Amino acid sequence: MEKLARQQIQALTPYLSARRIGGSGDVWLNANESPFNNEYKTDFARLNRYSDCQPKAMIQAYANYAGVQPEQVLTSRGADEGIELLIRAFCEPNQDVILFCPPTYGMYAISAETFGVERKKVPLTTDWQLDLPSIEANLDRVKLVFVCSPNNPTGNLVKRADIIKLLEMTQDRAIVVMDEAYIDFCPEASTVDLLAQYPNLAILRTLSKAFALAGLRCGFTLANAELINVLLKVIAPYPVPVPVAEIAVQALSPAGLARAKYQVLDLGANRAYLQVGLSMVPGVQVFEGWGNYLLVKFPDGDALFKAAWEHGIILRNSPIENCVRISVGNREECEKTVAFIRNYYQ
């Protein structure tokens, strides 16, 4: 049957998510999931009826949280669907181009390839910042520029001044898509305040990380109302299951927000524990991170990754040479990981 698929799909290498890679262990620090398993109440009523395309209570709750108007919010099945919607809505196949800056999240390229949209890569600088002159030189036919901050997998923040310069250089030419999946761990670095000034800005958000709802598959796109209305033309008619909307509203309630804030602080302490503990291991370099993960460079990254895997500690290998991404888990998971790595290098 594969021969019946589009040629681009036949040649496509799918994104290897943490779940697809698999593994077996008792310490799972490979998918940037939260270690907190929070409880929610839903009576599963009205399941015989379709949900609203954009549930009003859910949209209003996230608008209040993000500090925008409801008409500036679109919800989707995770931020990944937001990526696809932007590409489908704004890029002509075999004509338009997306631009992204590796090393970064892999789904920008795969989503574009799936829809027959060309990809341009402008690598980040040696300190993992935007190479603005090279981006400007490559803007021909580009409709979307994807920027991840905090960046996955490096963990760093992209300079705000550079984001503004990028928005300026792409005005009336392209949309800058800020992937803020991890911004809840450093909300002061958000670009949401720039929406009022730049109609070519779109922001991707998710409840998967700081809100500990990866299994809910609930994401948001923030933008000006005109851009949101374009996305509403291509989104599925019933993208949000009723229980998802109900749980999201609870997570965004005052009590839910207070809990998320506390858990973010707890993860920040565990991240600091990981950073200090691993930095004391000879030959190991820990890069500063602003999300719920750290990028760590080892003398032999692939070997360390495999040894941890065999020991039941599941980490995430990286396209960056000798680097491994380690999610921030609970304190016990962090302690086990640091102890294993210390013993490995003794």
Curated annotation (Swiss-Prot):
Associated pathway: Amino-acid biosynthesis; L-histidine biosynthesis; L-histidine from 5-phospho-alpha-D-ribose 1-diphosphate: step 7/9
EC category name: transferase
EC number: 2.6.1.9
Cofactor dependency: pyridoxal 5'-phosphate
PROSITE patterns given in the database record: AA_TRANSFER_CLASS_2
InterPro entries named in the record: Aminotrans_II_pyridoxalP_BS, Aminotransferase_I/II_large, HisP_aminotrans, PyrdxlP-dep_Trfase, PyrdxlP-dep_Trfase_major, PyrdxlP-dep_Trfase_small
Protein's name according to its UniProt entry: Histidinol-phosphate aminotransferase
Lineage summary: Bacteria, Pseudomonadati, Pseudomonadota, Gammaproteobacteria, Vibrionales
